[in-house]
Amino acid sequence: MANRSAAKAEALAQELDCRAVDNAAVAAGADYIFLGVKPYMVAGLMEKIGPVLAARKDRFVLVSMAAALTIPDLRERGCGDWPLIRIMPNTPSAIGEGVIFYTCDGVTAEEEAAFLENMAGAGRLLPLDDHLMDAGSAVAGCGPAFVDLFIEAMADGGVACGLTRPMAMECAAQTLIGAARLMLETGRHPGALKDAVCSPGGATIQGVRALEAGGFRSAVMEAVIAAYEKSAEMK
């Protein structure tokens, strides 16, 4: 692995039990070369490693994590005609609970299968058309920040009602995890699960009423759309 900071590369190499090298060494020998740079840095990186890649006689796959850059954008910035996978991971990937959207171009079925096998530990890998990657990123890439804000607000409510901060935070986070897993594992619509908790005249439906009065659904939708529109501006 390589990093702009040699010290950071060494630290990460020790943590991940791999070798710290420079970009040229990665470009010369890796089967899957991850381009983990900001969008504006892709062209400069490819200008440096392009000659090394061009000299290779074996197949390799470029994997881009640059937000907002489509497959054509990446090719215009130096990725040429080489096999290319565009991915959009999110922060929970760090603990194996991520959502990783991906789209392939010029990649064989065997190369895609090997990529999926090696990335399986990061979370759920979902194929997505290139033109929809920004939409996926607005939900899964930006979503953790929205969810964190919700957890913090829910915990604040718990504190206001008398819970300690640690208890309220743990309770809010675990409740979100449990509700999400219940939906995923049962396949039930979230609206149906919500209705199952809302007893007639009960406390939950009053809380739902307060959320609706505050524009909760609209605010969440607008957050996703705003993130999507910003991604479009970043191209």
List each model region and its residues:
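NAD(P)-binding Rossmann-fold cofactor-contacting core
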Residues: 1-13
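Conserved beta-strand termini and adjacent loop/short-helix elements that scaffold enzyme active sites
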Residues: 2, 21-23, 87, 128-130
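Rossmann-like NAD(P)(H) cofactor-binding subdomain of soluble oxidoreductases
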Residues: 6, 15-16, 23-100
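Small-residue helix-packing motif on alpha-helices
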Residues: 9, 27, 42, 164-171, ...
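Internal alpha-helical scaffold of NAD(P)-dependent oxidoreductase catalytic cores
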Residues: 73-83, 99-136, 147-185, 230
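Short pre-catalytic strand/loop immediately N-terminal to key active-site residues, enriched for Gly-Thr
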Residues: 84-85, 133-138, 190-195
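NAD(P)-dependent Rossmann-like dehydrogenase/reductase catalytic/cofactor-binding core
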Residues: 173-235
